[in-house]
């Protein structure tokens, strides 16, 4: 049973009360170590991620279900299909080890099959969101030297215009109709081609090129190896499942996250299949459809990003509680949840365990994971370091390593950390420093129990008269106002002060909340130097699909509003 109270984080300006450093922190090296025992990862240098996945034994039956049609395949059938499709891709399409193949696909039961088939051949997969523009697709195709793409009907023309060979992936699961309407895809999937030479794939070989979000700069191709994918499967997905009394094979997961993103891919294309779990795949997230799918398929686990959690909470308020009876856990990642949204969820679905986690594309989604118990809950935290992971909190001004309770840039190290950025040694050298430490760019701190809290991005820090202000701190104050639905804060240049905090506020309809009211409210809650100096009322806060605030868009709105008055 999930508790309904929130843990209040320690004052980040004060150090932990421990007289001696806790066992998981070294004051000499500044290294935080996972509180969990290290796990033994496969040592065979010639082990590929697909072989590692299917080497795990379990008692699971159904592997994948299409949420719309109910079409399903078992775990046994999945392994056979992956081998069969790999043979078709090898013989019909001529794909060989080292070839780069793009998946520009929406969520479907076919997605994991195609991905696993390709990397089992030693091919390198780069994924793209199917809603990508022609310019975005062109950039990635060019940078990755893509020669072949699997895509849905609406993107065939875009990819063909770029000189890429295209395989149109059917949206149907009626194989008789597929054989007539899409014979090439049917041939790859269903015909028998016999022997395929097994390539020598090393754990250090690149398996995937996943693109970072690019919310704070140009998107970059992240090189992930078979070793990285195995680490994600073992340290993120399988380890988390091992912490609960019920077996992973009894869980039914709802896959509404994009499978083309590292969060969805690590869970639904790799890790959960090794546990024998059942995955119900939705083409795209829709709150109304989610309610029906949870009830129909008795979903037990639902990984989400913040916008999905907010939509689910809102929809759940108008639905009979019995609909969500099967739901055990909702896990959120990609962006921190505000306290207001956490409280709202816990009040609406008190029987559901809510956890947050932390990971990056650059760490193959391995980082931290939340754990709640009857005695201890840290809903605002992103959890404890995963096994085999280490961290440092670094003062971004002096470079010194900081103890628990102090804010600094989070560095992480472990087997999930990427090989580097594609064709960008300068960016790689700036991000991976001092013997494989990944600089995350996130401001964070560990509390006295080893739980990690993400505060903000270093690039977003507002510098007011020499003081440093984290926008997320002010955003937390703003959304605590009963008449404010959502808020975001960014910096505006100021000759006298350097920068000043500007708040973008979404207020409740039919309220008379004024800019002055907002400024006064924040001023009553924070130190004088942290006050909001300007307020802009907006209808919505611009955010990425994963819920990250698009601060570049806020600055654009701010610039346009200033220009319009000149």
From Swiss-Prot:
Q: Could you tell me the keywords of this UniProt record? A: ATP-binding, Ligase, Magnesium, Nucleotide-binding, Peroxisome, Ubiquinone biosynthesis
Kindly state the positions of the motif Microbody targeting signal in this protein.
564-566
Q: In which tissues is it expressed?
A: Expressed at very low level in leaves.
**Where is it located?**
Peroxisome
Q: Name one GO cellular component term.
A: peroxisome
Q: What class of enzyme is it?
A: ligase
GO biological process per UniProt = ubiquinone biosynthetic process
Give me the ranges of the annotated region Disordered. Answer: 1-21
* Presence of keyword Magnesium: yes
Residue numbers spanned by region SBD2: 357-421
EC number from the UniProt entry: 6.2.1.-, 6.2.1.12, 6.2.1.27
Return the InterPro entries for the record.
Answer: AMP-bd_C (IPR025110), AMP-bd_C_sf (IPR045851), AMP-binding_CS (IPR020845), AMP-dep_synth/lig_dom (IPR000873), ANL_N_sf (IPR042099)
A Pfam family hit: AMP-binding
The record's PROSITE patterns line, in alphabetical order, gives: AMP_BINDING
Q: What does the record give under GO molecular function?
A: (E)-caffeate-CoA ligase activity; 4-coumarate-CoA ligase activity; 4-hydroxybenzoate-CoA ligase activity; ATP binding; CoA-ligase activity; trans-cinnamate-CoA ligase activity; trans-feruloyl-CoA synthase activity
Coiled coil ranges: none
Question: Cofactors per UniProt?
Answer: Mg(2+)
Tell me the null mutant phenotype: Cannot use 4-coumarate for ubiquinone biosynthesis.
Summarize where (E)-4-coumaroyl-AMP binds, as residue positions.
263, 334, 356-357, 361, 459, 463
Listed binding positions for CoA are 284, 465-466
| Annotated ATP binding sites | 212-216, 220, 356-357, 361, 442, 457, 548
Q: What does this protein do?
A: Contributes to jasmonic acid biosynthesis by initiating the beta-oxidative chain shortening of its precursors. Acts as a carboxylate--CoA ligase that can use preferentially p-coumarate, ferulate and caffeate as substrates and, with a lower efficiency, (E)-cinnamate and 4-hydroxybenzoate as substrates. Involved in the biosynthesis of ubiquinone from phenylalanine by activating the propyl side chain of 4-coumarate, and possibly trans-cinnamate and 4-hydroxybenzoate, for subsequent beta-oxidative shortening and the formation of the benzenoid moiety of ubiquinone.
Family, as annotated: Belongs to the ATP-dependent AMP-binding enzyme family.
PANTHER family per UniProt: AMP-BINDING DOMAIN-CONTAINING PROTEIN-RELATED, LONG-CHAIN-FATTY-ACID--COA LIGASE
Domain-related comment: Both substrate-binding domains (SBD1 and SBD2) are involved in the substrate recognition, and are sufficient to confer the substrate specificity.
Protein name, entry field: 4-coumarate--CoA ligase-like 6
Q: Which gene encodes it?
A: 4CLL6
């Amino acid at each position: 049973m999930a508790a309904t109270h929130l843990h209040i984080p320690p004052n980040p300006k004060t150090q932990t009360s421990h007289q001696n450093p806790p066992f998981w922190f070294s004051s000499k090296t500044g290294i935080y170590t996972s509180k969990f025992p290290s796990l033994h990862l496969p040592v065979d240098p010639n082990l590929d991620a697909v072989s590692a996945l299917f080497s795990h034994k379990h008692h699971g039956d159904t592997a994948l279900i299409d949420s719309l049609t109910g079409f399903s395949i078992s775990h046994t059938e999945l392994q056979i299909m992956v081998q069969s499709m790999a043979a078709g891709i090898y013989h019909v399409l001529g794909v060989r080890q080292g070839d780069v193949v793009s998946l520009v696909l929406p969520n479907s039961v076919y997605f994991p099959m195609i991905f696993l088939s390709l990397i089992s051949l030693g091919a390198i997969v780069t994924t793209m969101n199917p809603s990508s523009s022609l310019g975005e697709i062109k950039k990635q195709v060019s940078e990755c030297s893509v020669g072949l793409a699997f895509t849905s009907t609406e993107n065939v023309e875009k990819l063909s215009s770029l000189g890429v060979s295209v395989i149109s992936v059917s949206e149907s699961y009626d194989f008789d109709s597929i054989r007539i309407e899409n014979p090439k895809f049917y041939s790859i999937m269903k015909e028998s081609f016999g022997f395929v030479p097994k390539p020598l794939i090393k754990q250090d070989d690149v398996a995937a090129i996943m693109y970072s979000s690019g919310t704070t700069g140009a998107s970059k191709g992240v090189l992930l190896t078979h070793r990285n994918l195995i680490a994600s499967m073992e340290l993120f997905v399988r380890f988390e499942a091992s912490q609960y009394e019920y077996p992973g094979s009894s869980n039914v997961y709802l896959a509404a996250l994009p499978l083309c993103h590292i969060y969805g891919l690590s869970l639904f294309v790799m890790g959960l299949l090794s546990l024998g779990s059942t995955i119900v795949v939705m083409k795209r997230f829709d709150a109304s459809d989610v309610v029906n799918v949870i009830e129909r398929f008795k979903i037990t686990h639902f990984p989400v990003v913040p916008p999905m959690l907010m939509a689910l909470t809102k929809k759940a308020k108008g639905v009979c509680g019995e609909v969500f009876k099967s739901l055990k856990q909702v896990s959120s990642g990609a962006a921190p949840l505000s306290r207001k949204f956490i409280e709202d969820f816990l009040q609406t679905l008190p029987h559901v365990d809510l956890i947050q986690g932390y990971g990056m594309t650059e760490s193959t989604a391995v980082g931290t994971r939340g754990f709640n118990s009857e005695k201890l809950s840290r809903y605002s935290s992103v959890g404890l370091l995963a096994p085999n992971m280490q961290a440092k909190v670094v003062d971004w001004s002096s470079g010194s390593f900081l103890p628990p309770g102090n804010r600094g840039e989070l560095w992480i190290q472990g087997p999930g950390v990427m090989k580097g950025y594609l064709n960008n040694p300068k960016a790689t050298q700036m991000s991976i420093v001092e013997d494989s430490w990944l600089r995350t760019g996130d401001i964070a701190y560990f509390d006295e129990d080893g739980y990690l809290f993400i505060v903000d991005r270093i690039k977003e820090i507002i510098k007011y008269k020499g003081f440093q202000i984290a926008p997320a701190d002010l955003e937390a104050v703003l959304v605590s106002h009963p008449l404010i639905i959502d808020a975001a804060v960014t910096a505006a240049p100021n000759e006298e002060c350097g920068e000043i905090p500007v708040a973008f506020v979404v207020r409740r309809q039919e309220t008379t909340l004024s800019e002055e009211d907002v400024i006064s409210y924040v001023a009553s809650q924070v130190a004088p130097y942290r006050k909001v100096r300007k307020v802009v009322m907006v209808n919505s806060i611009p955010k990425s699909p994963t819920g990250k605030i698009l601060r570049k868009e806020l600055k654009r709105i701010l610039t346009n509003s200033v220009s319009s008055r000149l």
